[in-house]
Design a protein with these regions (language model features):
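Residue-level signature of outer-membrane beta-barrel architecture
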Residues: 112, 126-128, 165, 232, ...
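Acidic/polar loop-and-plug regions of large Gram-negative outer-membrane beta-barrel proteins
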Residues: 143-147, 160-166, 170-233, 237-239, ...
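Short sequence motifs at beta-strands and strand-loop junctions characteristic
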Residues: 27, 63, 84, 113-116, ...
Length: 301
């Protein structure tokens, strides 16, 4: 991750054997993975942070920025026996960056980066060993970018303070926290086969920046997490460990998404498509609202 600087955890895992990450194209709204052919109903059943499950639901799942992590691990196979309800294919565990008493140095870095797609990234990393027993780490990030689809934007601001107390070689207590605000999470939709893989009835294809949503689509998310990790080694055989975390996630979503072209049999009973002439149905994309399940049609040009 330090070498490739991925925008999301799923992007960091794109070359992992047995893991599929492209179910939503270029969208980084969620880290949905398919492991060994199995997909979880929601990533909150399948994604862990510091050994604890990231609680949530399908539209209110937490997402951790890869810059805040020191590792991302894939556990393949049916792991429900050990970890509870999860996908038969396996699960994802992420390890957050924490202060390390072995890093006996002061380090501070502030890096602004401007990349393709008008992407501006400002990162902050600071760690310091205060004494032989105490150390802390502060990691932050601010990112703003235009998404591939026209009118879509990504904004993320995150900070993760960590503090470690290590009174001896056998005892370790680490305070971990993570705060993230995303006023805009970017594009979260999909395009129809007609106009992309296959041409439209008029022989044309949709532009690569085509957005099937509405101009006022909004999708914001706010995450707060506070917890600790404690372990004490009594001897070579017995060790006590305890992890605890309190988390609060809030999302606000009001968006329109594509539901296939009107000529698709799945949309035969759609009110918006039924009003069209048969010759026009191949030119219109059926759409629905996430919030109130309303409907609206959009002309494909």
């Amino acid at each position: 991750m330090a070498l490739h600087q991925p925008k999301s955890v799923k992007e960091a895992l794109s070359y992992t054997p047995g893991v599929s990450v492209g179910t939503r194209g270029a969208s980084n709204t969620y880290d949905h993975l398919i492991i060994r052919g199995f997909a979880a109903e929601g990533q909150s059943q399948n994604n862990y942070l510091n050994g604890l499950k990231l609680q949530g639901n399908f539209y209110n799942d937490a997402v951790i920025d890869p810059y805040m992590l020191e590792r991302a691990e894939i556990m393949r196979g049916p792991v429900s026996v050990l970890y509870g309800k999860s996908s038969p294919g396996g699960l994802l565990n992420m390890g957050q960056q924490a202060s390390d008493h072995r890093t006996a140095q002061k380090k501070f870095s502030l890096k602004p980066v401007l990349t393709a797609c008008s992407r501006l990234v400002l990162t902050l990393a600071m760690r310091w060993m205060m004494t032989a027993f105490y150390s802390y780490r502060l990691t932050g990030l601010a990112r703003s970018a235009n998404a591939q689809q026209k009118g879509s934007e990504e904004q993320r601001y995150a900070i993760a303070p960590a503090f470690t107390w290590r009174p001896d070689d056998k005892t370790n207590f680490t305070f971990l926290s993570y705060f993230q605000n995303e006023p805009e999470t970017g594009y979260y939709g999909w395009l129809p086969k007609e106009g992309t893989v296959e041409p439209l009835p008029n022989g044309k294809r949709l532009p690569t920046d085509f957005n099937e949503g509405a101009k006022n689509n909004t999708y914001s998310r706010n995450e707060k997490m506070v917890g600790y990790s404690f372990d004490h080694e009594f001897n070579d055989t017995f060790t006590v460990r305890q992890n605890l975390r309190f988390a609060e996630n809030k999302t606000s979503q009001n968006s329109v998404y594509g539901y296939g072209v009107c000529s698709d049999p799945a949309n035969a009973y759609s009110k918006q498509c039924a009003a069209l002439a048969p010759a026009d149905k191949g030119h219109y994309l059926a759409r629905k609202y996430v919030v109130d399940d309303g409907e609206a049609a959009k002309l494909l040009r």
